[in-house]
């Protein structure tokens, strides 16, 4: 997931990016910081602005390909720089001011034609809430149920457990224990397990966990640990048989 926030200098891009990245546990790439460090060899010619955008886009794609959500705040003033950056999953235009502090950027600025959110005022909290709700992003501060397992492979019994988990909270995290190769019962690497789950459970939030074997907690820690009883038919599902059927 790549979320790009564009707009003139001083329009509130970084403020919103900081708030949003914190709520969805994303990597935050600030274009000013990247320009001052990694891209310090670039100036402000049209060609260098396009190259700056291209490099930022490649950085965001690299991080996203590793399973990380990325929020990029970046002026991205022209159609050429936006094309060089690439199409994000979500584009947010902060249209809160008519002029920024840099005259050359004001002259370069071209009104965006493609965006998912268009904000004309400052309200990072309300805007973050709106983006998370409408784009169905996972809010790391919302009450969440944890569903922990190996899922070698994901099957009907796991789906039933997921439905029970959603009865507890509106948001569920499916945590996949990284047990690949630890036994003959664990032939699937994490990414294949995750892909299979996402194919079956379209809105699922799947994360990689260590090979958790024990859970220890203190008194009255603010959460519940419970075993969910499923029907005898679902409990009788054999993961070993499922693996045989799938040729694993």
Tell where the protein language model's regions lie, with residue ranges.
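ATP-binding Walker
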Residues: 11
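Small-molecule kinase domains that catalyze NTP-dependent phosphoryl transfer to phosphate-bearing small molecules
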Residues: 94-138
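Glycine-rich phosphate-binding loop used to anchor ATP phosphates in small-molecule kinases
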Residues: 45-99
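Nucleotidyltransferase catalytic core that binds NTPs
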Residues: 136-248
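Short hydrophobic/aromatic beta-strand immediately N-terminal to the Walker A/P-loop
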Residues: 2-4, 146
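Conserved substrate/cofactor phosphate-moiety recognition/catalytic segment
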Residues: 14-61
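P-loop (Walker A) phosphate-binding loop of NTP-binding proteins
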Residues: 8
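Hydrophobic/aromatic beta-strand patches that form the interior of the parallel beta-sheet core
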Residues: 3, 29, 90-92, 117-120, ...
């Amino acid at each position: 997931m790549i979320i790009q926030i564009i707009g003139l200098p001083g329009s509130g891009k970084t403020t919103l990016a900081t708030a949003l990245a914190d709520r969805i546990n994303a990597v935050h790439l600030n274009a000013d910081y990247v320009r001052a460090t990694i891209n310090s060899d670039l100036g402000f010619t049209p060609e260098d602005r396009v190259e700056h955008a291209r490099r930022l886009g490649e950085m965001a794609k690299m991080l996203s390909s590793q399973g990380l959500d990325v929020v990029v705040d970046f002026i991205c003033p022209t159609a050429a720089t936006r094309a060089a950056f690439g199409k994000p999953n979500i584009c947010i235009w902060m249209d809160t001011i008519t002029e920024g502090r840099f005259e050359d950027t004001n002259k370069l600025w071209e009104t965006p034609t493609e965006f998912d959110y268009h904000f004309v005022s400052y309200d990072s909290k309300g805007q973050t809430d709106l983006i998370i709700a409408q784009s169905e992003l996972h809010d790391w501060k919302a009450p969440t149920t944890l569903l922990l397992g190996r899922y070698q492979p994901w099957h009907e019994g796991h789906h039933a457990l997921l439905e029970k988990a959603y009865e507890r909270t509106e948001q569920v995290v499916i945590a996949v224990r990284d047990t690949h190769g630890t036994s003959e019962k664990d032939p699937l690497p994490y990414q294949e397990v995750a892909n299979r789950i996402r194919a079956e459970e379209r809105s699922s939030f799947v994360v990689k966990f260590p090979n958790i074997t024990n859970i220890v907690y203190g008194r009255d820690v603010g959460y519940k640990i419970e075993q969910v009883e499923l029907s005898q038919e679902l409990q009788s599902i054999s993961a070993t048989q499922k693996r045989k059927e799938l040729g694993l």
